[in-house]
A protein has these predicted regions:
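N-terminal and secondary-structure boundary signal
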Residues: 1-333
Length: 333
């Protein structure tokens, strides 16, 4: 297959060209049940959205293309992290409102689906039972819309990892507590197939996945393809991360005999070499969140892969607020 690389010019035409160059709608029927899965995992006013969540203009452009194609059964689905601010307000809906996806849905007559609420289907991933939203499993055509960002646990968070949003909340936690995060991400992409992947690279994020410690850079790039492995290999390469060193991609490549050879994958549009960056994915809470505040006597070690996104966001917010309210404080007693 082919991965398209298109510079974003601020109009829907960029998205259209990216889809056309990779023949993204080749297998899409007008009567297909379509699910758009953006990365809208969390949204809060203290966290700038740039590089963290899928840009609303990209989602809307995809909706418009689907309607032009003749599709009418279109849903936008996400399962955001547990709401750590107000348990009475489902956080997925909070995210839809915060990013304007609720407005897009009303404007174009498409459905919004909270994947956290199920119903779910039990799926076995290498001996570990997880629950996947039935909405994702029954879709005839799944459009995977991740962001071009790094991740302090998995090096990158692109198409493969974006499908974690299709899991039930308890299954998301199980991915981390099982101590097999990368393998489970790999296996999940066998159970839930992406028919089109479109990586939103309008911004790219260093030291992700959130923007309290992470830094967003304007990139104005759209990456599109019909093979999630190829798109993630190209996306990781652009971020400056060796895709062969990403464990869930290596797991998948070994199981399916896939190659990391970029020449074999093939790209069209912009020249890949000219797009390469060197972003840092490593993130140490001690240095990034406590260091600038000159707080002493307190330690926040790297949690490894055992911390889920909800807990990670909570930790980042808590440390950020602690540092803001207690600069240069010695907690050592």
């Amino acid at each position: 297959m082919t991965v398209s690389l298109v510079k974003y010019d601020g109009t829907p035409d960029s998205i259209r060209r990216a889809v056309e160059l990779c023949n993204g709608f080749e297998n899409l029927g007008k009567n297909h049940r379509v699910l758009i899965k953006p990365n809208n995992c969390f949204r809060h006013n203290t966290m700038p959205p740039y590089g963290m969540v899928t840009t609303t203009t990209v989602v809307e452009a995809v909706v418009q293309l689907l309607l032009e194609h003749g599709c009418r059964d279109i849903s936008i689905g996400e399962g955001a992290i547990i709401n750590i601010f107000d348990e009475l307000d489902p956080y997925t809906k909070h995210g839809f409102r915060g990013t304007g996806l609720d407005r897009v849905a009303r404007k174009h007559g498409v459905k919004l689906v909270d994947l956290n609420r199920g119903p779910f289907r039990e799926v076995d991933l290498g001996g570990i039972s997880v629950r996947v939203a039935r909405e994702a499993m029954k879709a005839d055509f799944l459009i995977n819309l991740p962001v071009l960002k790094t991740h302090f646990q998995t090096k990158v968070s692109l198409g493969f990892k974006n499908l974690k949003g299709c899991l039930s909340p308890d299954s998301k936690k199980r991915f981390h507590t099982s101590k097999r995060l990368d393998r489970l991400i790999s296996l999940l992409n066998d159970a839930v197939r992406s028919d089109l992947v479109l990586i939103d690279g309008i911004y790219m994020l260093e030291k992700g996945p959130e923007t309290l410690a992470g830094k967003a850079y304007r990139k104005d790039l759209i990456i599109a393809g019909r093979d999630v492995f190829e798109c993630d290999v190209v996306g990781a390469t652009i971020l400056g991360v060796d895709p062969a060193e990403i464990d869930y991609l290596s797991e998948f490549a070994g199981r399916h005999r896939r190659s990391f050879d970029l020449a074999a994958i093939g790209t069209v549009g912009e020249e890949l070499e000219s797009l390469k960056e060197q972003l840092e994915w490593r993130f140490e809470p001690d240095q990034e969140l406590l260091g600038p505040t000159k707080i002493t006597g307190l330690s926040a070690p790297h949690p490894g892969q055992t911390l889920c996104s909800a807990c990670g966001a909570t930790l980042a917010l808590a440390l950020s607020m602690l540092g803001k309210d207690n600069p240069e404080t010695d907690f050592g007693g």
